[in-house]
Amino acid sequence: MKSLILLAILAALAVVTLCYESHESMESYELNPFINRRNANTFISPQQRWRAKVQERIRERSKPVHELNREACDDYRLCERYAMVYGYNAAYNRYFRKRRGTK
């Protein structure tokens, strides 16, 4: 019984020390931390937005070979299942690479 009371007291002390609400947890005094779209769009200028879109298009055009192989494998269900077990490289080699001796 004494150990149960001691355990309850230790648990209560742990709750008090760990759940203490300090001033640091109240750093933001705003009631609503979210902003509307108009104010959110003022952070990035239209020029930066345009530049980001252009860079994204360039990245889409010049994808690495392994990513193109993975996308090809994702479109074919058997290849995708095989890839879940053996990996995308092995699956692509099995289903899409030309076999030796065939033209």
Curated annotation (Swiss-Prot):
SUPFAM superfamilies per UniProt: GLA-domain
Entry protein name: Matrix Gla protein
Residues modified as Phosphoserine: 22, 25, 28
Originating organism: Homo sapiens
S-S bridge residues: 73-79
Disease: Keutel syndrome: An autosomal recessive disorder characterized by abnormal cartilage calcification, peripheral pulmonary stenosis neural hearing loss and midfacial hypoplasia.
PANTHER family with a match to the protein in the record: MATRIX GLA PROTEIN (PTHR10109:SF0)
PTM sites of type 4-carboxyglutamate: 21, 56, 60, 67, 71
Subcellular location as annotated: Secreted
Changes after translation: Requires vitamin K-dependent gamma-carboxylation for its function.
